[in-house]
Regions:
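Active-site-proximal alpha-helical scaffold in enzymes
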Residues: 88-120, 163, 169-198, 266-273, ...
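Short, well-ordered amphipathic alpha-helical segments that serve as non-catalytic structural scaffolds
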Residues: 31-45, 69-73, 98-101, 162-168, ...
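Flexible glycine-/small-residue-enriched beta->alpha junction loops
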Residues: 113-167
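Phosphate/pyrophosphate-binding loops at sites that engage ATP/ADP/AMP, CoA/4′-phosphopantetheine
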Residues: 41-51, 172, 276-279, 310-322, ...
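Active-site nucleophile and cofactor-binding loops and adjacent substrate-binding regions
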Residues: 66, 85-94, 260, 325-327, ...
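N-terminal extracellular/periplasmic Venus flytrap/periplasmic-binding protein-like
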Residues: 14-16, 27-36, 44, 178-272, ...
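Glycine- and Gly-Pro-enriched alpha-helical subdomains that act as flexible
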Residues: 272-320
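Single conserved hydrophobic/aromatic residue that forms the stacking wall/gate
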Residues: 351-360
Length: 360
């Protein structure tokens, strides 16, 4: 096959709405949400599911989800049992890593068609008790939150990830006002984009339960029309325990950081040769990718290193790009990385930033 035929391309993409913590999507597990994405991707793309070489899905808080979450989503989504599935846990980068693995397999000639994405239900993360396997002989037992221990707690720094975000703010020179202004701009852009229907095509409708009632959810629950600078300025710091490390004003609040959410998203990645042979419309091509790592407390600066490494591979510079999408959980991180990469914010965030769509 000609090398151009091995180029990975995206032929279809979709996502569920982003549900608030304990909100409209909380009755569905992560594999349930993933299955809806799998089913809709196959239907939208118009491909026979037996042509899939693999399903790769990211999932972080796997406690209580059940064995092989990606396999659950795949089979429930209508993919034949003969198609293998792989679950990826790279914390926040899990879903994107799934897409990278799909592209790599296709470029290597190991596959022609892969469904890749991510799924999470933070609302359904359980509590558990350590030590009960051997039996508790004396004293109290404490419940631990799997959402915190498996997803939001740094195993190296032994602190909330938000504490590392506070460190990022200081190292990156980002103030509380900077973060609030950035968050407000993001909210306004998101509300505008939603009102103009810019996300309508990518969002699939989800049937869920609200108590005994069945509801259909087709909108993101995060963005708030009533957000104002006055409201954001009144919010208390989200990680007061960080005050022991940082004596000046704390920066992270519920208004300038991502919330806890439920949702799933995915793409179908094909080789260009397969797409052409089957008459499939191409949405985008995947030209390159880079993964990067830093010291744990510096993790929020990793995108700067990754993007610089990517541009070195591509022999480009940041000014060559007309649009940059930087998906980060904290406004302070987004700002620190924007400054670190010298990105023109006017061409970077046309609709929203991620803290908005996932906001509380």
């Amino acid at each position: 096959m000609h090398s151009k035929d091995r180029e990975p391309v995206i032929i279809q993409s979709c996502r569920t709405p982003i549900g608030k913590f304990l909100g409209a999507l909380s009755s569905l597990s992560a594999p349930d949400l993933g299955a809806l994405v799998v089913e809709n991707l196959i239907e939208r793309a118009g491909v026979e599911p037996q042509y899939l070489d693999e399903v790769i899905m990211g999932n972080v808080v796997g406690t209580g989800v059940g064995q092989a979450p990606a396999r659950q989503a795949s089979v429930r989504g209508g993919v034949p049992e003969s198609v293998p599935a792989l679950t990826i846990n790279k914390v926040c980068g899990s879903g994107l890593k799934a897409v990278m693995l799909a592209a790599q397999a296709i470029r290597a000639g190991d596959a022609n068609l892969i469904l890749a994405g991510g799924m999470e239900s933070m609302s359904n993360a359980p509590f558990y008790i350590r030590g009960m396997r051997n039996g508790l002989k004396f004293g109290n037992a404490n419940l631990e939150d799997a959402l915190l221990s498996d997803g939001l707690w740094c195993a190296f720094g032994h602190c909330h990830m938000g504490t590392h975000a506070e460190y990022t703010a200081r190292k990156g020179g980002v103030t509380r006002r900077d973060a609030d202004e950035f968050s407000l701009r993001s909210h306004n852009l998101a509300i505008k984009a939603l009102s103009e229907g810019r996300f309508a095509e990518e969002i699939i409708s989800v049937s869920s339960k609200n108590g005994r009632e069945k509801v259909v959810v087709d909108f993101d629950e995060g963005p708030r029309k009533d957000t104002s600078m006055n409201t954001l300025e009144k919010l208390k710091p989200a990680f007061p325990e960080a005050s022991g490390k940082y004596q000046d004003e704390l920066t992270i609040t519920a208004g300038n950081a991502a919330g806890l959410n439920d949702g799933a998203a995915g793409v179908i990645v094909a080789s260009r040769g397969f797409a052409r042979a089957h008459g499939l419309e191409i949405e985008a091509k995947i030209t390159n990718y880079v993964a990067s790592g830093l010291e744990p407390r510096d993790l929020f600066f990793a995108p700067v290193k990754a993007v610089n490494d990517l541009m070195t591979k591509e022999k480009t510079q940041i000014s060559d790009y007309d649009l940059v999408e930087l998906n980060e959980a904290f406004a302070v991180q987004a700002l620190a990385d924007i400054r670190g990469l010298k990105i023109d914010i006017a061409v970077s965030y046309t609709h929203l930033t991620l803290p908005t769509i996932y906001s509380v």
